[in-house]
Amino acid sequence: MATYLEFIQQNEERDGVRFSWNVWPSSRLEATRMVVPLACLLTPLKERPDLPPVQYEPVLCSRPTCKAVLNPLCQVDYRAKLWACNFCFQRNQFPPAYGGISEVNQPAELMPQFSTIEYVIQRGAQSPLIFLYVVDTCLEEDDLQALKESLQMSLSLLPPDALVGLITFGRMVQVHELSCEGISKSYVFRGTKDLTAKQIQDMLGLTKPAMPMQQARPAQPQEHPFASSRFLQPVHKIDMNLTDLLGELQRDPWPVTQGKRPLRSTGVALSIAVGLLEGTFPNTGARIMLFTGGPPTQGPGMVVGDELKIPIRSWHDIEKDNARFMKKATKHYEMLANRTAANGHCIDIYACALDQTGLLEMKCCANLTGGYMVMGDSFNTSLFKQTFQRIFTKDFNGDFRMAFGATLDVKTSRELKIAGAIGPCVSLNVKGPCVSENELGVGGTSQWKICGLDPTSTLGIYFEVVNQHNTPIPQGGRGAIQFVTHYQHSSTQRRIRVTTIARNWADVQSQLRHIEAAFDQEAAAVLMARLGVFRAESEEGPDVLRWLDRQLIRLCQKFGQYNKEDPTSFRLSDSFSLYPQFMFHLRRSPFLQVFNNSPDESSYYRHHFARQDLTQSLIMIQPILYSYSFHGPPEPVLLDSSSILADRILLMDTFFQIVIYLGETIAQWRKAGYQDMPEYENFKHLLQAPLDDAQEILQARFPMPRYINTEHGGSQARFLLSKVNPSQTHNNLYAWGQETGAPILTDDVSLQVFMDHLKKLAVSSAC
């Protein structure tokens, strides 16, 4: 029989699902006492090369309030050609096409190995993909040139029938006509005035009939492909013209006097982009790709004035309620994000500048629509260029790794209710019998819209056990959950992916050990971290840390083995032993600690944490540290100051940064040039090994991490020193002068002190 670890891994590979608990407590009361909620990490479009989509539509339950999809958990009467829904127990007739089914001739959706299955919807017209570039022209010359080259390169990566459009902005906003005649025309809008969707569509001529003979018919925006085709054209038609147009783009002509910022109308440019797509291609897969090199400084959505002597808001300003533009700007971008999400479009933000660009205010545009957020120092860096190129990578079938306009519908058996979701989604406000009144994350619904997603996009979905304590579930009973994702594939097909899972119920009184053994501490850590980060958006930082600490203490009290008032007796079983250290590193992470990070950086880190899969999320919480030495092959070592030794090279992966750190002796040898001497060939190989491994990570990761190569005493060694557990500090005098690692100059508590304190509180009867 497979161990729980193997079971968890198999389910993740097959269904893209990781649950916090893999055996479920059978009553509401007991579930609340488990501390960590029953929840899962769902990767709706996890890549499955072994799962070709079936070319027919799913069979649905006939009950209007259910509409669950036929799945391997349903009871089937092959003689009568009936099936019973495992969620509402409705008996349903099979459609005529299923007339030949039997125990030995089952359709794929009834086979246990197809707990996840994908259907291709044949009906309905297919729509092309749409890419609308919104480009800031208030950039330095070399930055603008690099961005233009990246955009020109991207045209060659788009499908030939994809529609593409261009909006540029500085003090004014220009919507470019993309005709094939080679004449450059554009509509110019003032950057200080907000316009309604109707005004934008009227000004661009999107609501007028395309030809005089159509005057008699009332005009509908999406009825006039001619009108929209002036601004959105197939790549194969305007490839050359658009390449030339991009090449001719100039810096914003408005002069910028000394001591002033350029006037940048980002808010109006985005508003026009949203209005253009809203009027021409609602409910069609589209990406608005915003490229900005500085903060919005005028019009709706401005986050700072044009006076350089007045800096952009900091965390200190926000805490003192001294960020005068923040609330109004955030409201503007939230309104745009909600309109974009309602139309099934997504917004990407590519912000490259040395100072902040307003990501804090604009974050909802990417967070609510499933768009990408990329932050860098300049468009003229490999970090931006390679990250941007990676957006257009293709899968094993030659299709883009992106999907559009998805809706996620969650169905549960009657003992469960849905509390909410945390991830790149918005609520569709679909109430129903399986929706809980207690909200965790975005709740009050059983359906969410995810306008942009890729094979790693992951949502945290939280549930509530509602079965009462006095109505026991029969022995061997199983709870079931179905995830139904409707989406537009990058090949423009409409598809439906259905994942149906079941887990055993267990009585906590008699089967607590089973429930304990089925605890997935990695998934639980990420799910609790998502809750913490979600709370951090609206609560004070110390309050969130206190909440996380309380949950950890309660969990240790519930599942630890100990004698009252005796911290030395405290033990956690293997399935819980790593959880406290995940929480220790989470408390120190940039998701919850804003010290030393700008508001934009915090928004960027939190954006990625809310959408990455389990493996990447764990790296973000607790970075991975590898050691390279002459003593053997590279090996993972503790993320601890004791691992920083003079004769070692360390490679640290934090997801956002890849840090190579040379120990003191290694750094001296490199300085002396030993690697260039033939007799020290092995030293040359030692120096090269972490570089090769770092390159491998850099090639695979999206967004591309920042690459830092440093050494003992180097200024950038701080990236490593700030992440490791400070087990040796300037206060541990006994460690000085010994080969026990590097002392860290910090007042932060170490993991050992944290654990000692946790044990003390867990065994205390006062808690």
Curated annotation (Swiss-Prot):
In Swiss-Prot or TrEMBL terms, this protein is called Protein transport protein Sec23B
Q: Which gene encodes it?
A: SEC23B
Q: Which residues carry this modification: N6-acetyllysine?
A: K564
Q: Where in the cell is it found?
A: Cytoplasmic vesicle, COPII-coated vesicle membrane; Endoplasmic reticulum membrane; Cytoplasm, Cytosol
- Residue windows of the Gelsolin-like repeats: 634-720
- Provide the effect of V594G: In CWS7; aberrant aggregation; causes mislocalization of the protein in the cytoplasm; reduces interaction with SAR1A; confers endoplasmic reticulum (ER) stress-mediated cell growth advantage
**Consequence when changing E109K:** In CDAN2; the mutant protein is unstable with less than 5% of protein detectable compared to wild-type
| Family from the record | Belongs to the SEC23/SEC24 family. SEC23 subfamily.
- Species source reads Homo sapiens (Human)
